[in-house]
């Protein structure tokens, strides 16, 4: 009757565990004293408050204009970013990783003429991007359209290989390579 390898391994493991319980490293935990209390902190001396006159307001520049009549009705989010570059169809063509509402998908943007500009192919895209049929470049703006020619989303380049914008429903959408 021989001893199997599993039995021998179990016996060795039990011996190691029991030997660990006999260690003197854990035996003196009852004799450990707490650290000494920290030294007291001295109070900060209180100074006196001095009184002085403020400078005349006429020596400061004028406040910016608050005339809102020229800007009424303008949606700031719809304005193009000042740093956005002008786009070309060649810069947009290709396959993009799209992100909408925390979900992601892929969008193919070949330079095949279709509808408002060029054909677009969404692959398992969520929400409004599922209706995507075409795309077009309009100056600094990339516009995505549905099959009826309605705008699905408007985006601007926010860096090399990245577009950020909103769907017509107001959801943030990002395209990246």
Curated annotation (Swiss-Prot):
GO biological process entries: positive regulation of immune response
GO CC list: cell outer membrane
Cited InterPro entries: Inh/Omp19, OM_lipoprot_Omp19_bac, Protease_inh_b-brl_dom
Lipidation (N-palmitoyl cysteine): 21
Region annotation Disordered: where it falls in the sequence: 28-79
Keywords: Cell outer membrane, Lipoprotein, Membrane, Palmitate, Signal
Matching Pfam families: Inh (PF02974)
Top-level taxon of origin: Bacteria
Cellular location(s): Cell outer membrane
Gene Ontology molecular function: any one: endopeptidase inhibitor activity
Entry keyword Membrane: yes
Residues anchoring lipid (S-diacylglycerol cysteine): 21
Cleaved signal peptide residues: 1-20
Keyword Acetylation: no
UniProt miscellaneous comment: Elicits an immune response in humans, mice, sheep and goats infected with B.melitensis or B.abortus, but not in B.abortus-infected cattle.
Stated family: Belongs to the rhizobiaceae omp19 lipoprotein family.
The name this protein goes by in its record: Outer membrane lipoprotein omp19
Organism this protein belongs to: Brucella abortus (strain 2308)
Upper taxonomic lineage: Bacteria, Pseudomonadati, Pseudomonadota, Alphaproteobacteria, Hyphomicrobiales
Gene expressing this chain: omp19
